[in-house]
């Protein structure tokens, strides 16, 4: 067993993000990309333009990815971060192609994917997209989510690495009018290929356009050990595993 350095986990708790290197070997990255590149682009979960290729409900759409993602190092990391059972909250693939002008403004990840709509105290707003139902849950659920971003390419300021505000997750849901007060403390988070960036959903983050010809391909996974109330289920977790 290869344990994650204690200071990395402490950085994650304090700053709201951290990077764990060498989770996937080059051959494992090639295997993941092969499955993704063989996929079609049909249905509401797929979005393909000149600036972005994205797949939502990723593991429901491409179940062959599941055993490739859950290698021994990933399983160890997940167990270090969250007690069992770890529910899959969200799974998305992002490709920021070479020369992309796609910009992501400062935000927190406030919406979660669920299997249906249910009128519950503290849950809302709701929205329904082609891929399913999404809702903003109470803060306690957002605080319990851990995001693991698997980087299939090396990523830095030149090809759209995330900019993050250390410690911003500790301020809860930040009103849009107050975000500018936090961004002067932002920093770029470079991530090597095969590494996993850990992030808390309430960490303020943004992404600039790519400045060079390198792609930035990422598998974005969110997990929680919490159960939702009243029989509501995390949508990805409710999808059948293969």
Question: Predicted regions span which residues?
Answer:
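Catalytic core of non-heme Fe(II) oxygenases with the double-stranded beta-helix
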Residues: 100-190, 228-235
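A structural signal for short, well-ordered beta-strand segments and their strand-loop junctions
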Residues: 19, 87-90, 147, 163-164, ...
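Active-site rim elements
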Residues: 62-67, 135, 184-185, 207
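Non-heme Fe(II)/2-oxoglutarate
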Residues: 42, 162, 169-187, 192-198, ...
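Residues that flank catalytic or metal-binding motifs in active/ligand-binding sites
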Residues: 89, 144, 158-160, 215-219
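Non-heme Fe(II)-dependent double-stranded beta-helix
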Residues: 1-15, 20-129
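A structural signal for short, well-ordered beta-strand segments
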Residues: 90-92, 148-150, 219-223
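Short, solvent-exposed loop/turn segments at secondary-structure junctions
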Residues: 25-26, 94-96, 111, 155-157, ...
């Amino acid at each position: 067993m290869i344990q994650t350095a204690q200071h990395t986990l402490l950085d994650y708790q304090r700053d709201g993000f951290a990077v764990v290197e060498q989770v996937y070997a080059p051959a494992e990255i090639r295997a993941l990309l092969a499955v993704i590149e063989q996929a079609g682009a049909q249905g509401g979960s797929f979005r393909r333009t000149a600036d972005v290729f994205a797949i939502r409900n990723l593991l429901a759409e491409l179940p062959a990815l599941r055993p490739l993602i859950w290698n021994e190092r990933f399983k160890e990391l997940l167990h270090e971060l969250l007690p069992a059972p770890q529910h899959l909250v969200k799974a998305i693939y992002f490709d920021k192609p070479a020369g992309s002008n796609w910009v992501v403004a400062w935000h927190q990840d406030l919406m979660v994917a669920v299997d249906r709509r249910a009128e519950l105290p503290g849950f809302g707003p709701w929205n329904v997209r082609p891929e399913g139902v999404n809702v903003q849950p109470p803060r306690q659920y957002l605080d319990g989510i851990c995001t693991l971003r698997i980087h299939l390419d090396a990523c830095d300021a030149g090809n759209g690495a995330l900019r993050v505000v250390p410690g911003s997750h500790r301020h809860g849901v930040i009103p849009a009018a107050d975000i500018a007060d936090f961004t002067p403390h932002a920093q770029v988070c470079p991530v090597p290929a095969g590494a996993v960036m850990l992030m808390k959903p309430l960490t303020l983050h943004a992404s600039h356009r790519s400045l060079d010809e390198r792609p930035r391909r990422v598998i974005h996974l969110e997990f929680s050990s919490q159960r939702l109330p009243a029989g509501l289920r995390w949508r990805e977790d409710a999808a059948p595993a293969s």
